[in-house]
């Protein structure tokens, strides 16, 4: 409890610098990441995760960290959904908030599962649920904010004539525009080659953030643009889909490292 209160007290300062609306991918996007991860688990890891989560799948628990935002007891977790890397800086060269960020939280959760000593998570099930969500968040380019516009939340825009903002466009508007269920979406995008899986899973959590930072630089519409629609979807949907796929593959990589021997791939 003392740890939670300490984090809670620091949130007010940290949220001045970081994106305030941080729901990551919308519900469909997070479920896509979770299901892709399940598809790439080794058999031993799949059994271990099922034993930890019970009847809940990775796809269905991947939104847990957004759902608990309605419970003020978990407000200290709000800054853990994102990080800030200003233009021209790297994660190593920029300041990091005391209350934590998505990169530090992912790394801490991995350590807690490895050691079975839970500090920021209450237990192993919560740690797995948090990983399922936060790995997805980090692959949403605007969850690596530039420190000036709350991760694109301040960039107001119309999406097919409806009021939105750039953060929301990437969280959910682009995904919802495809009019697919999460299982249909997974069937569409989950086609990584063995080489891609290997390369993506070898990269570090900081690498993932710096990928998002690089993508972020190219997804802002011109300053004079007031509405987005078909052309923006055409230009960016392949990038978004790749980030969903990478998030799922990398989540599977973490869970395989934690719970499986590398030779035992799920059939």
Give the positions of each predicted feature.
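Bacterial N-terminal signal peptides that target proteins for export
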Residues: 2-13
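N-terminal, motif-rich segments that launch catalysis or mediate targeting to/interaction with membranes
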Residues: 23-134, 141-267
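N-terminal signal peptide c-region/cleavage motif recognized by signal peptidases
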Residues: 19-21
């Amino acid at each position: 409890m003392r740890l939670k209160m300490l984090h809670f007290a620091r949130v007010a300062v940290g949220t001045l610098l970081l994106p305030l609306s941080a729901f990551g991918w919308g519900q469909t996007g997070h479920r896509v990441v979770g299901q892709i991860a399940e598809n790439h688990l080794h058999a031993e890891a799949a059994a271990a995760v099922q034993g930890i989560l019970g009847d809940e799948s990775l796809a269905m628990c991947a939104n847990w960290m957004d759902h608990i935002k309605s419970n003020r007891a978990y407000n200290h977790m709000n800054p853990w959904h994102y990080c800030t890397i200003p233009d021209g800086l790297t994660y190593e060269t920029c300041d990091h908030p005391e209350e934590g960020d998505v990169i530090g939280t992912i790394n801490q959760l991995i350590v807690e599962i490895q050691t079975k000593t839970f500090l920021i998570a209450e237990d192993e099930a919560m740690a797995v649920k948090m990983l399922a969500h936060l790995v997805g968040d980090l692959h949403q380019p605007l969850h690596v904010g530039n420190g000036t516009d709350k991760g694109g939340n301040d960039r107001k825009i119309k999406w097919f004539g409806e009021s939105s903002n750039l953060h929301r466009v990437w969280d959910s508007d682009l995904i919802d525009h495809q009019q697919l269920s999460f299982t249909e979406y997974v069937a569409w995008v989950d086609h990584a080659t063995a080489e891609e899986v290997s390369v993506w899973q070898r990269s570090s959590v900081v690498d993932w953030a710096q990928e998002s930072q690089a993508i972020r630089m190219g997804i802002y519409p011109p300053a004079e643009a007031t509405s987005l629609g078909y052309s923006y979807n055409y230009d960016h949907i392949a990038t978004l889909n790749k980030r969903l796929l990478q998030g799922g593959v990398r989540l599977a990589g973490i869970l395989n490292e934690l719970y499986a021997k590398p030779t035992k791939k799920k059939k």
